[in-house]
Amino acid sequence: MSDTTAPAFDFQDREPFWQNEWKRRNTFAVPDVPPADRPKYYVLEMFPYPSGQLHVGHVRNYTLGDVVARYKRARGFAVMHPMGWDAFGLPAENAARERNVHPGKWTMDNIATMRGTLQRLGFSLDWDREIATCLPEYYGKQQKLFTDMLGAGLVERRDSLVNWDPVDETVLANEQVVDGRGWRSGALIEKKKLSQWFLKITKFAQPLLDDLKTLDRWPERVRTMQERWIGRSEGARVRFALHQPPAGYDEDLDSVEVFTTRPDTLFGLSFIGISAEHPLARKVAESNPQAAAFIEECRRLGTSEEVIEAAEKRGFDTGLRVANPLDPEKTAPVWIANFVLMDYGTGAVFGCPCGDQRDLDFARKYDLPVPQVLLPPGQDAETFVLGKKAVSGDATLFNSGFLDGLDPAAARTKVIERLEGLGAGKGVVNWRLRDWGISRQRYWGCPIPIIHCDTCGPVPVPDEQLPVILPEDVTFDRPGNPLDHHPTWKHVNCPHCGKPAVRETDTFDTFVDSSWYFARFTSPHAETPTVPAAANGWLPVDQYIGGIEHAILHLLYARFFTRAMHETGHLDVDEPFAGLFTQGMVTHESYRDDSGWLYPEEVERQGDQVVRRETGTPVQVGRSEKMSKSKRNTVSPVDIIERYGADTARWFVLSDSPPERDMEWTAAGVAAAARFGQRLHRLVASVAARDAADSAHGATGDDLRRVTHRTIAAVGEALEAFTPNVAVARLHELTSALADAERIEGAGIAAARREAARVLCLLTAPMMPHLAEDMMAVLEPGSALVVERPWPEAEEKWLAVQSVTIGVQILGKLRGTIEVPPNAPKEEVLAAAKSEPNVARLLEGKRLVKEIHVPNRIVNFVVAG
C-alpha cells in the first residue's frame, strides 16, 4: 500500500472515540496524596473566566500545558493537571442587568459551554478536580482562610480614600476611572473615605522581594516587574516645619513629612510638592477656591500611575512655605502637584531640581529657584552652571555646608545622622507595595464573613456558620450592591452577644479567588481548605503557564497568599509556582470594507488580493494584531475543531513560533497543519500494511535508525526546554525521512521503518494525542494505548556523529566537499581532499604552496602556476 492510498484519519469519528477511551479508563486521575513510587509533577494553566466562549489564545495556553503534562506522564511522573473556573466578577452582574438573567445561571451556562470545548480538544485534565470559585464548596473554604488570617493579624479594617461612583454606588479601581468619570456610568467620580478590609501583604514585603532570587525558572522580566512593584527604597523620612503657619493650622498641619531616597541633596531644596489628596492641600482648599478648583482638576486626571506619568506636570502654589531642617533660615514654597501620589511614601515630595529631571522641568516651568548642589566629575565648583539636564550618575556635593566634598552615599549617612540628632527625620526603608484592599461593593463575589455588631464591633462568622452563602433572590433594578437591599440576608444576630447585627455586604476582590485555587486543586472535595498531606505533597506547582499581563498582581497575590496560608497552618510551602512560563498572544489580520469590520470567514484570497466572499469586492487588510471582538479578527476554536479536528488546532498553535512570542493565526497555516496530520496517518498506515512486525534490522536501515534516534533525543530536549516548535520541526524531519525510506528496498529497512513509525506515534502524542493513538492502533492492533506507554529512549550508538562534512577550497574558493570521520588525522583529510574528483582536476599541473587544515571544518590549498 502506498503513502497516498492509505486510509485517512477520520477526526470527526476518532477524536471522540479516543477521548471516551481515556475517560473510561480514568487515565488522567491521580490521588490526592502523590504516590510514593514515582516523582510528582503538577502542571497548571491559569484558569479562565467563564465568558462563554474559548478563544484561540486559550487553545494555545492549554495546549502548551497539555504537552508538558503528557510528556511528563510518559517520562514516568505522576502528573496532576486540573481545570477550574475563575467564576466571580463584574461581567456576570452586567449580564444580569442587560439580559435579565441571574449571574449564577449565566456563569454556569458559560462554564458548561467552555467545558465542552476543552473536552473536545482532548486535554489530559483530571475533571474530578474541577472547581468553580462561585460555588459555596469553594468560597466557603476561602471564608475560613480569611477568618484564620484575621486571627493571625494579617487582616485589618481601616478607612481608605476610594474612587466612588455616585450613580453605580460602588468603588472603582484606578483603571476604571477615565477622564475623571466612571467607566460604565459616566458619572463624575468622587473621592470618598470608606471603611475597607485590607490584607497585610506588606508584612511579607521583604521575603516576597528576597525570594524572587530563588525563582530561577521564572522569566527574568517577570521577576524584575515584581521587584519594581514591591519597590524597596532606602532613604529618610524628613519633617519640614511650616514657616509662619497661618492661624488654624494645628499641630497635625504644622509640618510636611516627606520620604526621600536622596536626603544628601536637602541643601538643593527648591519646593515641596504635595498630593491633591494631602491633608494640607484639603486645608488650603477650604479657604482658597482656586486651590479647590485645581484639586478637582487633579481628581479628574484619575489616580492611575500610567496616566499621571504621561500627563503634563502642573502645580498650584499654596502660599505656604517650609523651613529646610538643615538650614532653617532658608525656606521653600509648598505646591500642590498633579504628579504626586497620595499612596506612595507620605503623599509629599521635596523638589531638588539639580538632581531630578522632573523637578528641574517643574522648577523652570514655574520660575522656582534651582540651587546647585551636585558637581559632576571634572567640573569646577566656581564655574559650573546647570544646563537643561539634571545631574545624574557620579557627582560630588557642593554648596551643601557640612556635606561639601562628599559623594552621595557618604553624604546620605551623615545627613541621616544629623536629622536624627535634630529630631527632624530618620533613616527608613520605604515600600512601594501597599496593603491589599479587598472590599468590593458587588453582589457576584465571595461574601466577607464578618458580622457588624454595635456592641461587639466587627465579629468573624464562626466556623460552624460557614459558608456565608450568597442569596439567590436578588434584583438588579436599582444602583448599588443588591446585598445592601436584602434585609433577610443582611440582618442577623451577633454570634457573640446575640443582639441584632448586620452582615458585611462587601464581597472579596476576585483576585482573592485566584490567589489560592492551585492549593484547593490538591484536595478539591475536602471539608477544610487544604489537606496538608495533599497540598504539601503536590505543591509547589512545577509548571505554571499564563499571560504576561498577570505578571504583577495575580502572581504577587498568590505568593502572598501562600505565605499567609503557611502562617495559618494550611500549607508548609512558601512559593506557589516553581516554574512559570508566559506565552505570547495569538494575532490575526483584520479586514474591513465600506460596511465596517469583517470576520475572517467573510473574506477569501484570490491571487494577491483579499475579497469579500459574498460580493467579490476588495477589502482592506490591516496588520496582524491581538484578536478583539471590536475588530472581528477572531477565530472560533469550535469552528476549527469541526472543520479540521482538535489535533490540527493543537499542532498549529505549537508549530508556528517559539511559545513566548506572539503567533499569527492564518488559515493557510491551519490547513497545512491538517495536511501534515493526514500525511502522517497515511504514512504510518502504509508502513503497517507493508512491513511485517517481526522484520529484522539490517544495514540498509541504519540511516533511518540514525534519524529516528536523533529525533527521540532532539524532541525530548525541545520539550524539556519548553520549545515545542523545535520538537515540531524535528518531527517533520523524521516524517520526511520515513517517507523517503518507503522507496528503499533491502534487508533491514522494513524493521527501521516500523521503528520510525512507532517512534512517530510516541513522539507526536503530547501534541496530537488522538492521531497518535489512532496510528498506534493501526501499527500495533490490540496493544497498549500510547498514553500508557513510556517515552522512547534514544540509543547512544545512533547518536554518535558518523562523519563530518568538510569544505575543500582552492585559493579560498569552495571547489568540493568530503565526508570524513570526526577528528580524522590531518594526513587522512588532506588525502581525501586531493582525491575529490573536482579538486583533483583543478590541482592537476599546479604547484602546492601551502596546505591549510582547520579540523572538522575546512581544507584550503594555496597553489601557484
From Swiss-Prot:
This is Leucine--tRNA ligase. InterPro entries: aa-tRNA-synth_I_CS, aa-tRNA-synth_Ia, Leu-tRNA-ligase, Leu_tRNA-synth_edit, M/V/L/I-tRNA-synth_anticd-bd, Methionyl/Leucyl_tRNA_Synth, Rossmann-like_a/b/a_fold, tRNAsynth_Ia_anticodon-bd. GO terms for biological process: leucyl-tRNA aminoacylation. One of its GO terms (cellular component) is cytosol. The gene is leuS. A motif ('HIGH' region) lies at residues 48-58. Its EC number is 6.1.1.4. It comes from Gluconobacter oxydans (strain 621H). The keyword Aminoacyl-tRNA synthetase applies. One of its GO terms (molecular function) is ATP binding. A motif ('KMSKS' region) lies at residues 626-630. Keywords: Aminoacyl-tRNA synthetase, ATP-binding, Cytoplasm, Ligase, Nucleotide-binding, Protein biosynthesis. PROSITE patterns: AA_TRNA_LIGASE_I. It comes from the Bacteria. It is found in: Cytoplasm. ATP binds at K629. CDD domains: LeuRS_core. It is an enzyme of class 6 (ligase). It catalyses: tRNA(Leu) + L-leucine + ATP = L-leucyl-tRNA(Leu) + AMP + diphosphate. Belongs to the class-I aminoacyl-tRNA synthetase family.
